[in-house]
Amino acid sequence: MLFRSRKLDFSNLSEAPVGTAKKIEDLEVNANNRRSIGLVAPGGNLRLYNLAGKAVPANGTSFAAPLVTGTVALLQEFGDRQLRTKSTLPANIKPRWTLDARRHEVMKAVLLNSADKVQDNGDGLRLGMTRTMLAKNNRDWLESEAYSDRQIPLDYQLGAGQVNADRAYRQFSSGQYSGATPVPMIGWNYHALDVGAYQDYLIDRPLAEGSFVSLTLTWDRLVELTDIDGNQEYSLGEEFRDRGLNHLDLYLMHAEDDRISQSVWSSISKVDSVQHIFHQIRDPGKYKIRVHFRQAVNLPRQGYALAWWSRSNNQ
């Protein structure tokens, strides 16, 4: 089997500010140790034509961004087609598509959850990922803080991994599942919780020993416009007010357990608007996902998007 890897370009690395350049670098990264990189995409050593018609090398995020936005456009086109098909189906058939498919939180959860981290060996245990991403010092995602620390959802340099349009399509096309009944191995949902409440998603088949499970939870920080002139849009001189971030947590649990202290793994960052779990299953069996609205900083009800990808012995 051909091993495929890609190391991030040095010029585009993100890292915690340290040393003599810390004062300058502090201005370039998120505050409070929040992860500024969510996703990476190919943008180095590209051959592009300049205005003179000559092929020249190009590097940078400006060339990586179109791959991400293009993937979103493809997913939205597919989602709209599913919504149009839904309107022609008999009333007794309930397709897994609603207008939630257009929400930006859903797109973010789908892209992050389907990103490539470590190449699959061909047995599907690594969820069919197509390449291994390498950060500085040639370390992969399994060697990152994000893999081993429950309070760190994303890697500083790799984020959740490299965007993969085909895997994003597979993640998104699986459809929406509310959690009211057992959910399939791959899926997504948009929902809202009141403070203190939680929502469980019971996976309908036992997870395979040695397989990985990928879970991503996304929601928004509440930022409001100080609308001085009352025209409900930004005007020169007006400012935006940060009302803070509600605190949601994400847990992977055995199906029969109910206390979060019994969770197999969790993502419980206090500063990020994303929680992410990429965890290897040591004990095969039935599992469930739990989303918990732990603390309200602004509004007492919070919308969120969840995406999951897992593997059973029968896949």
Where are these regions (language model features)?
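An often Trp-containing, charged/polar helix-loop segment at the C-terminal end
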Residues: 77-146
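Extracellular/periplasmic catalytic domains that process cell-envelope and extracellular macromolecules
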Residues: 30-33, 40-41, 103-104, 207-208, ...
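Flexible glycine/proline-enriched surface loops and loop-helix/loop-strand junctions
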Residues: 51-57, 90-95, 149-150
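Extracellular S/T/G-rich loop segment that most often corresponds to the catalytic His/Ser-adjacent loop
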Residues: 1-80
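Secreted peptidase-domain scaffold signal
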Residues: 125-246, 305-315
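C-terminal edge strands of extracellular/lumenal beta-sandwich accessory domains
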Residues: 103, 108, 113, 199-203, ...
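Hydrophobic alpha-helical scaffolding
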Residues: 29, 57-65, 69, 96-101, ...
